[in-house]
Amino acid sequence: MAGGHPERRLIVTRLTEAEKIARMAKLLSQKQGLALPRYQEIKHAAELALDMLRKSLDAFARLDVVMAAQVVRQDDQVDEEFRAIMRYLITFMMEDPRTISTSLEILFVAKAIERIGDHAKNMSEYVIYMVKGRDVRHVTVDEIDREIEL
């Protein structure tokens, strides 16, 4: 098959798509004139997700399990940002029901960012599997660190 390994092409295509989504979400959060509740948290989560994507692509290209493990660790940060945004938006909507529509749009953006982080984490777990031959999808970060040291 011309053009390289089919699995790699599939993964790179999927991550390229996710990176575009993350950039769009980041741009949306930076729009001038939009009063976005939790703007800084959304921006921070988008930056983290983009960083995770870059690192996961690099880890894949280099088969770098150390960098892949860093991405897995970062996923907790993106998840926490999402939970904080969600808690705030729920409170915001309860206090003023007129904000429900805007809050839901923001929540969808935040969830998209969180899912991008999840995809980068999955990619990084796959890198560890390719190099070490062990499925680390359902183990702790500490166990992954121990696996890498072997």
Question: Language-model features: where?
Answer:
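Cytosolic, long alpha-helical scaffolding segments
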Residues: M1-L150
